[in-house]
Regions:
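Structural recognition of the beta-strand scaffold that forms the well-ordered cores
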Residues: 52-58, 99-105, 109-113, 131-136, ...
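Conserved functional hotspot residues or short segments at active or partner-binding sites
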Residues: 454-568
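Conserved anion/nucleotide-ligand pocket segment
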Residues: 355-429
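Glycine-rich oxoanion-binding loops at beta->alpha junctions
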Residues: 265-297, 309
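Basic/polar, cationic surfaces and motifs that engage anionic cell-wall
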Residues: 22-54, 59, 63, 106-199, ...
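Bacterial Sec-dependent N-terminal signal peptides
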Residues: 1-23
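Glycine-rich, aromatic-lined ligand/substrate-binding cores of catalytic
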Residues: 400-487
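Glycine-rich, charge-decorated loop segments at or immediately adjacent to ligand/cofactor-binding or catalytic sites
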Residues: 260-265, 333-355
Length: 587
């Protein structure tokens, strides 16, 4: 990261002169060359390398739109080529040249920095061999990336990837390589969009296209959403609807964890500070909108990112809102989003096998469907069963492939809830959420919830030996200790088990997520605990049976049944569900 403590001092030494930089075209990419900005030659030897990776930085200093890009590069070179003071009082040793290969200014103009065929430099400690360094002007922990900068960054990355045969999968932020916050939170959140050539376009983006906008034009709108209701550019669906002159946003509804995703217990009604609109909690006393709540609503919109497990509560909220829409003759629009853990893996006991899939209870633990597909299935299955069905419109995604996990969609990850910090957490969730039905900790209260098996009385080494004996695909284990806290990532959560107590734990890691079967892993984990700790292990029967939608698993474990025997018991029911599911897949 380009960090200097006395940037104003350095800029004061700019040579003010008239410059009409010639901009050249390179494969349709406009780049201001070193010659254009009157670069000095390197002052010492530079190390050649072969470009293999693309790494994004920010300058870490406030944007300076009034200064030309030529002057900025001259100042950067002056700073780089001599010993210079840093913000922390240390002295940066001289570099041969500007540290970055490309510089993107506030105007979106791109300038050539160091020759791309030579290694760059950094104030942080990482191996720069092969890294093409792109710096974007600004401090994106405090500032927003400008649209002009974003468009230029996309074009530049596309050019470099094509010209030097560099996979987009190699794109990373400086913070992925070293201990730093660079390139800042706003820019870093957008990097996934650079990794795929054709990112998924979510339903929220398509809502404003001509094909769909008439569904909401001049309508009074109620929105069910939370902090995940963001478009890839960082704009929130609520703000877009509130600001649009052709729509009238009248009511907001929030799910579990609230409309801002910062609450971990029952949520109360409130007012949205930004819009001044009332926010009705659908995870407190009220779980389904009432007729009174909907009297000023012409159309209901649902836009929330789910993770793909039945016991993640957002899809239950969606179904209840869908029921309310049907009962009150209000059109219901679902803005589709990816299934975070992919749309292929379907597994787990089916709550009411053989019956129409009209409720959440009829789903297996992992259903392999998007929220739009689920809404379609619930609606049509309800209609077949003589239950009220909604006037449903699913706005589908573009470029979505159901075998892709969330990090393959090109969409920025936004933690869907306080304890769902990463995609790895989401991958383990179908397995280790079952520990909520026991007296063990699943890791809530840590920065890796659902990635641990922990309790004061377990012996991690022997538990790992037992788990390894099952030879499960895609998972590894190691011993550790955890201390669950009530504050996680700045949010106060419901008090976790063993709060403030350091306890032994087994930490799990994904080694092959494509072949990892999370539901089966959950059964094997419960079996291992029952086998090794029959006296210490306690079932929380209502919770465990509620998660599994059956008491048969618990009873079988108590009877000493083997995991594969238990897993086999739901296979026929799963086949029946898959046949129903296949009718409603949109992708």
């Amino acid at each position: 990261m380009f960090r200097i403590g006395f940037i104003k001092f350095i800029f004061a030494f700019f040579c003010v002169f008239s410059s009409s930089a010639q901009i050249i075209e390179e494969s349709e990419l406009a780049v201001i060359t070193r010659e254009d900005w009157k670069a000095n030659p390197p002052v010492m030897e530079i190390i050649p390398h072969k470009p293999q990776f693309i790494t994004i930085h920010h300058t870490g200093m406030p944007q300076k739109p009034d200064l030309s890009i030529e002057k900025k590069l001259q100042a950067l070179q002056q700073f780089s080529q001599k010993d210079s003071p840093m913000a922390d009082g240390s002295i940066k040793k001289a570099w041969p040249d500007v540290p970055y290969h490309f510089y993107i200014a506030t105007s979106g103009k791109i300038a050539e920095g160091r020759d791309i065929n030579f290694q760059g430099d950094s104030n942080t400690d990482y191996d720069l061999n092969g890294h093409v360094l792109i710096v974007v002007e600004g401090d994106f922990n405090k500032e927003k990336l400008l649209p002009e900068q974003w468009e230029s960054l996309k074009r530049l990355v596309s050019f470099i990837s094509s010209e030097y045969d560099i996979s987009r999968e190699t794109i990373s932020g400086h913070k992925d390589q070293a201990e730093t916050t660079c390139p800042g939170s706003d820019l870093y959140s957008k990097l996934p969009l650079l990794k795929v050539e054709h990112p998924v376009k979510i339903g929220a983006e398509r809502l404003f296209e001509n094909e769909y906008f008439d569904l909401i034009r001049n309508k009074k709108i109620g929105v069910v959403t939370n902090h995940t209701g963001l478009l890839p550019n960082g704009e929130h669906i609520v703000d877009l609807l509130h600001q649009n002159p052709d729509t009238k946003l009248t009511m907001l509804f929030g799910p579990e964890h609230g409309i801002r995703g910062e609450e971990d217990t029952h949520v109360t009604d409130s007012k949205d500070e930004k819009t001044g609109l009332p926010v009705i909690s659908l995870y407190g006393k009220t779980r389904k909108p009432t007729t009174e709540m909907l009297k000023e609503v012409d159309v209901l919109i649902f836009d929330i990112q789910d993770i793909g497990a039945r016991y993640y509560t957002y899809i239950k909220t969606m179904l209840l809102v869908q029921e309310a829409a049907a009962e009150n003759d209000i059109p219901f629009i679902v803005l589709d989003r990816p299934n975070a853990i992919g749309g292929i893996y379907v597994d787990g006991p089916v709550g009411k096998p053989g019956e129409p899939v009209t409720d959440i209870d009829m789903l297996p633990i992992t259903h392999g469907m998007t929220v739009g597909e689920l809404a379609t299935m619930f609606n049509q299955e309800r209609e077949k069963s003589g239950l009220p069905s909604a006037d449903l419109q699913v706005i589908p995604m573009e470029n979505y492939e159901r075998e892709h996990w969330y990090d393959q969609t090109g969409l920025p990850w936004i933690k869907p809830s306080p304890n769902m910090l990463t995609l790895t957490t989401a991958a383990f969730y179908p397995a280790t959420c079952l520990l909520e039905g026991t007296n063990l900790s699943e890791g809530r209260g840590t920065l890796q919830p659902f990635e641990f098996i922990a309790a004061p009385w377990i012996k991690p080494e022997e538990l790992i030996t037992q788990l390894q004996s099952y030879d499960l695909d895609g998972i590894s284990y190691e011993t550790t200790r955890i201390t669950p806290q009530q504050m996680v990532d700045g949010i106060e959560i419901y008090p976790p088990k063993f709060m403030d107590e350091e306890i032994p734990a087994v930490e799990m890691s994904l080694t092959d997520r494509k072949n990892f079967k999370s539901v089966e892993a959950g059964i094997y984990i419960l079996h291992a605990l029952k086998k090794l700790y029959p006296e210490e292990l306690e079932w929380r029967k209502p919770r465990l049976d509620g998660l599994l939608k059956t008491d048969k698993v618990r009873i079988a474990l108590d009877a000493g049944k083997q995991p594969q025997e238990i897993i086999q018991t739901w296979q026929e029911d799963l086949k029946s569900f898959k046949k129903i599911r296949a009718q409603y897949l949109l992708y």
